[in-house]
Amino acid sequence: EINRKLTRDQKSIYRGMHGKHSTPKNIPTKESVELFWKGIWEQKSNFNKESTWLQELQAKYCHQAQQTKYRVSPEVLDKVTTKLQNNKAPGPDLLTGYWYKRLSFYRNHLATIFDECLNGDAEIPDWLIAARTKLIPKNSDAHLPNNYRPIACQNIMCKLYTGCLNTFLQDHCQSNQIVTHEQAAGKRGHWGCIDQLLINKMIQDEVISKRRDLACVWLDYQKAFDSVPHDWLIESLRLAKVHPQLVQAIHALTKNWTTRLSIDGSDQKMESDLIHYNKGVLQGDSLSVLLFVLAVNPLSFLLKQRKGYFMGSANERNLDITHLFFVDDLKLYSSNIDQMTHLLDVVTTFSKDIGMEFGQSKCSYMIAKRGKIVEAKDPLEVNGLRIYPLGLNDNYRYLGIDEALSYNGPLNKGKVATEYYKRVRKIWSSELSAYNKMIAHNSFAIPVLVYTFGVLTWSISELDEIDVKTRKLLTLTGNLHRNGDVDRIYMPRSEGGRGLKSVRTAFDIRLISLRQHIIQASDANPFMRKVHQHEGSGVIRIAEELLTSLDLNADPAIAPLECCKSAVKVIHKKRESSFISKVMHGYLAREMRKKPEIDFKTSLSCWSNRKMSSHFEGYIQAIQEQEIGTKYLIRKRLIQSGKEANIDDKCRLCRKHTEDVSHVIAGCERMATRFYLPLRHDEVARFLWNRLRKTHHAEGAFENNEYLCEQKEFIDTCESREYWWNIPVKTCTKVKHNRPDIIVWDHKAKTCFILEVACPLDVNVSLKETEKENIYGQLIRNMQMMYTEYTFTFAPIIVGASGYVTSNLKQHLNNVGFETKSIPSIIRQIQVLAISGTVKIAKTFMKFKS
């Protein structure tokens, strides 16, 4: 169940693992929820139209008006549709983006309807705008309605429409540079929080290294998204000279916003009546983010007209910064407390005029003189806003990083490492399959660390230590053999690895992409230009050394994503080469790559199976790496350690051959009939028997499976077909090999399919295929002489003990009637059955006393 849910809704699985947003037990009543949220959203508010700063904005804010009307074309709609997430929580229509992305025939008609709504020729239906707002608990105190965060889930149709409007609004803002450099949200080509953290880090380093004076204030808006008046949203669009057509379309949308609140408790569920939005924007909508950014962007414009902190050396202090904005997270900078008071006066006046308030308990300020924090005891009061100073030993959490005058490296690294290990334990001790654990590890655990790379200073030894501890956790939870190959863990699954991201590799890739981004962003953003100069001996230098070591093009014009892809390919290639070159661990992979008749891509496709257990996967890879505890391995380890190797390495059962991995899984004659045949060979053969019946639409295709397991010989008849299981064929002359595994007679079509299954050692797969064709050649010739009206087809189905197959297998399966499109799936399933049998055989063998 958890594996199916992960493919549909990853976020809910991750929230459960994180433990922050678990399903609440005591949820608030419907009446209390409606009373609280109606008091916020349905209470209409207006901005102060007599504000003194409004005239300044009208004169200087934006000079270039949009002249051309917008049109929703099928091409625009296609671009918006491709950005839809497949399984994101649906709105009231309960339809996910998966279906809209695959149904293309509707788009021309839908584009026409959206264009009519944009031009005002048609009204937007109420059902399309109506949202379903999910209340997510912020903490364990879930019985209070104010302890929930509202996340709006809109109908897919509405997401497509607002996506088109967002595209047009983005185009206008970008072409006219409406959004200031200080605001990192709602802009294309920006890295949001990372850009702000890098600029902030640069200022901190300069203050400390050059012993500068600095005053800074952290401000937090109270319910920012829920407070902004709708008339100010529209006025901010007009100030930005947005085309009246687009302004009118957005106004028609916002005035009809409605939603129903819902809470999913462990014992009960709650759904409210319809609530109207008379102020605020929807959380979770792309257009709403940009609307909010444009609503607070005039504040950035006003702050830029004041004096702040001048960056640079004593002779080159020509770049002034007063603040940094990320959506509603605001940090102010100035050279002294008097300048800061002027900045706060602008902020408080603007915020009061547009009806937004600050959460005073989450605001703080700090003063530094000559590069050191000065203790302040008195609160800072401006226009009724009281801000308390940050303690000398305290930190403020800004954009996810704890800071004071500088980022607290040990504290932050300790926090993210602890959170990372917590997530790793949750993932690898869960019931997820091996493939899904890999997905969760790479997308839920690794990003915790990646967010800090380039912002905090990490040493190579710290990164390697995290990788080592990660592998230990995987071993302790039984997901990795204690002697499993390190390189193979981080190789792609398409190359036979586990597909995990290494922390060290993630660090290298992050710094390479960050270098490209900083250099490219410095062309248009003066603050990022300063970051480029500041990081010349930091992130950029390390990234250039990495590019040189990987022998990659260091051209700054290459897009960060393309540069990362090239680096990942080189790193994976190096890991693969290292793994293959290892004498014992890489033996099987090395030998199989030498054989041109092996279909390497198909042979490794079984590792993409989403149902395979991680414990099972770890054990089969240990078998392939010859790391299970055979006598041969024990004796070899004793010799390597310099101890006396007086152990007998002969097989504990047959006492004839050396007990190595190849002998255990496919070479011991004492294991052949008791274990090799029933646990592996017969499992593959039974699967093919049932799939053949299913392909032929035989009734009860799986009814005789248990009965078939107990029978040495069996014949099943369905209409004009006969299915023979292990039946000897009587011929005119004596034939030694006359008992193939499966024979399918089609008396109507006059065809006969003969299937012979074998699961030898992987290195012997091609030899076994040739051998089967030779030894059954005489039988086929005799049958052709006896049944001249029939056409005979022989198909040797050979799959190695650990899943390797030849390039002929697809053709053999096609020859006996399997549909071409189903053959890859069939091969993966017989590979898994063969591998599963090998694991059972090895574990059974190791239980026998030596």
Where are these regions (language model features)?
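Active-site metal-binding core of divalent-cation-utilizing nuclease and nuclease-like domains
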Residues: 639-645, 699-756, 770, 798
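Conserved pre-motif C helix in the palm subdomain of viral-like polymerases
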Residues: 143-176, 192-198, 222-225, 276-309, ...
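Short, conserved micro-motifs composed of acidic
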Residues: 264, 358-394
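Conserved polymerase palm-domain catalytic core
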Residues: 221-343, 361, 367-368
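Surface-exposed loop/turn segments and immediately adjacent short secondary-structure elements
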Residues: 1-146, 156, 160, 386
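Basic, alpha-helical interaction scaffolds
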Residues: 384-460, 478, 513-528
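Conserved catalytic palm subdomain of right-hand nucleotidyl-transferase polymerases, strongest
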Residues: 86-95, 133, 143-153, 194-238, ...
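Extended C-terminal regions of large enzymes
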Residues: 466, 479-646, 650, 831-835
